Each structure stands twice: as C-alpha cells, then as structure tokens.
Amino acid sequence: GLQTSWFPMRHSENHGRLRRWSYLDKFGCQHGLFSGGQVYLLFLTVYLQEGCKREEMEDAMQIFHYGNLSASTVLIQPVDDHDLEEMETELNEIRKQGKADFQLIAVKVDNWNQDLSPWEASAVFGREGFGDGAGELLQFLLGQCADRRKTYYIGGYSLAGLFSLWAAYQTDIFAGVAAVSPSVWFPGFLQYMKEHDMRAKSVYLSLGNREERTRNPLMATVGDCIREGYNLLKMQKIRTILEWNPGNHFKDAGIRTAKGFAWLIRNQGAE
C-alpha cells in the first residue's frame, strides 16, 4: 500500500536554504517541527483554513509511505522524480531479495544540491553549486524515526547515497546504510570519513564499473574514493561490502538501490 504525506516548508531568500520545517495538521493549521499530525494528499482538497499561505503549499515536501506501515523494519530514502518512477521496481526487488517485511519511507527532495549536501562546494557541472542543507534535512528525517522499537535503515542513490553515508556519521539511529553509487567524489568527504567514526553497524557500498570513466576530473575520482572509503570502514570493524554493478551511473538505479536495502535486511542482527 501507499500513503502520502504533505509537509510544507518555508524557504528563506538565501539560495533556498531551509529556515525551518513546518507542516499542516488535518485541519490545515500550521505547526512547528514534529509537534502534531499529518495531512494526506487524498484529503488536500478539504479542511484548509485561513492563514495557511499558498507559498508554503507550493514549497511542500512530499513523503511517500510504501509497504507494511506496521513492519518493524523501516527504510528511509531521499528521492527525486526519477527514483519515484522506479519505486515499484525497487520495492519488488527488495521483497524478492530481502525476504522480510518492511516499510519504505520515501522523502522527495526538490532541491537536490542544496538539501543533500553536508557543506558548501563549488559547481562540478553546470552553474549550480552545492549548499549545506543536509543537517536540516537529517533533523526532519529523524522525526520519521520516533518509534525506537523499530529498526531504521537509510539509503539512497547518487548524492542521496552520499547524504545517507554522512547521516550515519551524525547519529546511531540508523542500524545500516545503503550508499548506492554515492557521490563520494564530493570535495572533502573522503577526508571526513578518515576523521570520523561510522555510527551505523552495517554499510552497503556499490558503484557501476564504468562510473569512474568520465571526463570530469573530480567525478573520475569516485572509484578510488569508494575503494578507500570501503577500506576505512573495514578498519573500523564495520560490517561492509563493496559491490560493483555493470554499467555507468545512470543504469538500473532502482534495482541497484534495492540490492543495497535487501543486503541490509538480510544481515539484520548479524554479528
């Protein structure tokens, strides 16, 4: 089953940096961070009271709930439109490979370079650089992990994979990480891994075997970076694997992500 929540956000004028998170309860009233209910998209057409600004509705973040909402295993995944298009494929593959009940919470991130970046960095391609919104996004995601009786995993593809890795250095709420084709070429991230301890017990890493064959000199370092990152995690006694997939960065994102989450589920509770 799929349930969808709507979480409006307010942005400041500074390059879309999130000033604070807010949402509407079922009657359309605005509240602060994590202080009450949710509104589902099925009911968006009703109960909007005066005082709920249209600009906040236009900036809304969507959260998609898949699978068994009462499952004890919860997968958290920042996604974009392409990830959502491949979600059914991903879910079916997780069910096939993971062989366990789960819920997947997909959080749609509209400003990819801003909200998934742990710190600011110059543009790698095009004109858009990277912001430092990862901290605020993480705080929001932690609000989805309130039931401590459940086991939470975080994962994502590309920059969302990098964010997921970084998030597991900040908190021990996540039992494992699926960093799938992660942007570990990100300036300063490998050094960050060297200087900090991973707080998750399990880390799945993967990369396409043609991803490092790119003309962009920074992105071409992704292979060396993920190999070194994998060795760093092994030195820290983290349960980890580095899997190589056929193809470049844009091949089979949904299936690759599913393989990562399924590996975490299969290894749940392993010593």
Feature map (PLM): residue ranges:
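The feature captures the conserved acid-bearing segment of alpha/beta-hydrolase catalytic domains
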Residues: 184-256, 264
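Gly/Ala-rich beta-loop-alpha elbow adjacent to hydrolase catalytic centers
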Residues: 155-160, 164
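Serine-hydrolase catalytic machinery in alpha/beta-hydrolase-like enzymes
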Residues: 64-147
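Active-site signature of alpha/beta-hydrolase-fold catalytic machinery across serine-
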Residues: 166-170
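A domain-start/cap signature at the N-terminus of enzymes
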Residues: 7, 27-34, 38-74, 102
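Catalytic active-site module of serine/aspartate enzymes centered on a nucleophile-bearing elbow/loop
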Residues: 257-271
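A conserved short beta-strand
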Residues: 173-185
